[in-house]
Amino acid sequence: MRELRSICLGILLVLGAFRLTISHEDQPLSKIAIHKAVFALDDNAYIKASPSILGMKGQNSDWLTVEYNSPNPSVGDWIGVFSPSNFSSSTCPAENPRVYPPLLCSAPIKFQYANYSSPQYKSTGKGSLKLQLINQRSDFSFVLFTNGLLNPKVVAVSNKVTFTNPNAPVYPRLAQGKVWNEMTVTWTSGYGINEAEPFVEWGPKGGDRTYSPAGTLTFGRGSMCGAPARTVGWRDPGYIHTGFLRELWPNAMYTYKLGHRLFNGTYIWSSEYQFKASPYPGQDSLQQVIIFGDMGKDEADGSNEYNNFQRGSLNTTRQLIQDLKNIDIVFHIGDICYANGYISQWDQFTAQIEPIASTVPYMIARFVIIHYVAHQLGTALTGPKLDLTL
């Protein structure tokens, strides 16, 4: 019996490792061998982005135009978007002193081929892209690469682009609290507890306002299990804040704003959002619940696309946004955004679901890593705990 258990455990571990290997292929950024990149700067090549300041109207996402030119264009040329804009070897963590660090040790947060919207690029050497950026707590730069994704060469580097306030509180996501009349709101910012005090201003719609303090958490590179999250996929996650809105009246509408009080006395505010409180337990009411899994994420500008693998995720979020008035709560039961060790993709995901998660509770099922194996083999496991883990 003991031998049989050992064999079964071995099979589970092998299948789990196999799943992890396959899932890594789901992430388009994993196709880029950024650690092999070399510099081949060409004075006759250029890349520039405009405008250089984004979010002038307070929005957390914005579009820009990237224009580029290469005297030696090829079908393997591509544009990488880097954030922070400083992506040189000076940002590489010290590892083996006997080995020279790579010239580039951070993967781009998104990429697109140079001929994507300029089909004549190979013959003219000129092209342009319309790209959408989200506020991710740092500035951006754009790089023109040649020689494909596996042996990339840097041909030109652009000017820097930034949002008006890169540290602003963004992407709120609601979750049902531990009791029926409690709601939690979690968001991301660039403000640590040594810079500002996070809080939520909230109250009944049209009524008096109150303030609830928020806790602050973050994590470092050392908290990651291994590559690519500890290496090319690492990106500073900023600070994650959570506030608790308690003693809500059943079925009442509430509005809220995210705030940070800087130690110089000034305040930083988010946009205003709203939600409807839960009904009283046992109340005779119709609750419309959305349950789905394996959604993934995608880019509205078409970047980071690999075999049209995750375009459907945009259709899902758009449909949910369209039907939002008829939705009371969302359960996303695992396989969230397929970041697979590329930390920047979590910001992209929370930005994609913000219109939903800021309005209705967006609950995440917390699975053990072996859930895929359990599904494949029909193994009976304890059900997942529903929790907000974004």
Task: Give the ranges of each region predicted by the language model.
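Divalent metal-dependent phosphoesterase catalytic cores across multiple superfamilies
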Residues: 24-39, 43-46, 54-56, 63, ...
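Cleavable N-terminal signal peptides of Sec/SRP-targeted secreted and luminal proteins
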Residues: 5-21
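Extracellular glycan-modifying ectodomains
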Residues: 68
